[in-house]
Amino acid sequence: DGYESTVISHGVDTNFFKPIDVPKPNDAFVVGCVARNQHRKNIPRLMRSFKIFVEENNLTPDDARLLLHMDWVDHMGWNIEHMAKNVYGIEEYLVPPTMGNMEKGEHPDDNGMVDIYNMMDIHALPTGGEGFGIPTVEAMACGKPNVICDYTTSYEIVGADKPECPEKMLLPHGLEGDDNLIETNRGFLVPYKDLMWDTPIRAAPMRALWDEHAAAKAFEHYYKNRDVLKEHSKNARAYAVKHYDWNNSIAPKWKNWLKTVKI
């Protein structure tokens, strides 16, 4: 008959990760991303989405900024400053680095992370695939809506009514397909036009490539509709507290499951 299984997700301390007031660069609209600068996070696609967003809306660095919390010279990824300056021409829009060399431990403490999340208006992740998405949930706990690639676990966190949701078919829309940008009550699910095979050294999964123009439209929607931003922020926080708080949600699930274990 097979094995019975129980899924219990990661959690977050929502009494620690919470909305606070922090200064923002020129009070600009800040698109942020907390991730490792590595292959599957697709950071260049986020940079191009941001470029499209500011160009189509004629925004200056006083109007909008891009905050990339990651090691900007990680050997697993890209040279962020080089890409911003020489490929996309958005170096003036970048918030200065919020951490140094990851391998040397040059990163902020937990309190610093709360400050970083709260500098953002929205959290964006063009990921090619996730096992869960801890920064996504931490951002929600801080009251930040997510604009995230609609692949693997993203729907569960940003789109579903609850984590224990039905499986969702994962199919690309194709290069000529409908953009199908999905607005939820706490963020946007960005469609992916195509998939690529990753290398065997990275376990060879298929990685999604998010639609850069669709993501730019999501940024624009939040920029122009601050009432929606405010409502989604409130909903993101409420969802994180209800479903991902360690004490109120995750720990009770573990306690209930442990009672069923036969030794």
Where are these regions (language model features)?
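Carbohydrate-associated surface elements
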Residues: 11
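Aromatic "clamp/platform" in nucleotide-sugar-dependent glycosyltransferases that forms part
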Residues: 128
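C-terminal alpha-helical cap of glycosyltransferases
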Residues: 225, 246-263
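Nucleotide-activated donor-binding/catalytic signature segment of Leloir-type glycosyltransferases, i.e.
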Residues: 77-115
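A short, well-ordered alpha-helix in the C-terminal region of glycosyltransferases
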Residues: 214, 221, 228-243
